[in-house]
């Protein structure tokens, strides 16, 4: 309303690493819960970090940071590896505001903890998805989306596309104490966790010919899950895809060939993150609209793409063009309420060599 910006340092002891960004959850009383982690961490500097405001809407009222390690000796013994990366909290009104927080913790796998007191205390962790034969170097990547009422939708991969030559995409959702496939059949209850990727719904089965995949976003369109992901026929060919589950099957639509990775590979070096695409995200209020980052004249630019009738073609509208710097990782915040403006955010990279070596700004633009 005023154009003024207010800032608050939540925790001053993180490493320089772009994985260490927070997720925010609006609590039932209007306060905001922030949760985040180091990138893996090490004893003494690892675990999940959280802050909560004491005055709704006032970021200056964030509490001091609380650091905790969601672990049990039994779980660590069974799944061997202990590290803490990512924190993704969601609240379900149908379960009296119960909070579910997911992250990559014990076993290097997606874990789940639950709170029934707005984040003051948490349950013991459970591993959600694991490899059929435990591999502590295998790490499924997950994206989440919740309706805020009863469901938490998940898309995930076998692992990292740098490691998995046929990295595929899977889907499931949580509801009423259990995890379910897209067709509504049950995978398992929370108490029966973990399950394997093959137990969930297959969104995209990768082959050497069609290319391994990585995931970028998930929302719902009239209750149907819609997914944004990338296929890599080769590491220098990044193809953006849209998929929707409708009438019992997944329908896939190619959006664009987006270019290659965005890290600025230095001379006489081998790129470490060849699957770092510019990125794409849904406008969750209109899932037929996405915002993408793609290469134009060797610069990464942001565009708005809208699915045309029939779903096979896309209308592309520029957001940035002729930029001095690369523009990557667009994102439209979820859960906008009536009267709130819709905002597109993205990273502007003056330099991005690696996720530990970058000089970036977060830019934003109001969108319809």
Region annotations inferred by a language model:
Residues 1-368:
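Extracellular, repeat-based ectodomains that mediate carbohydrate processing or recognition
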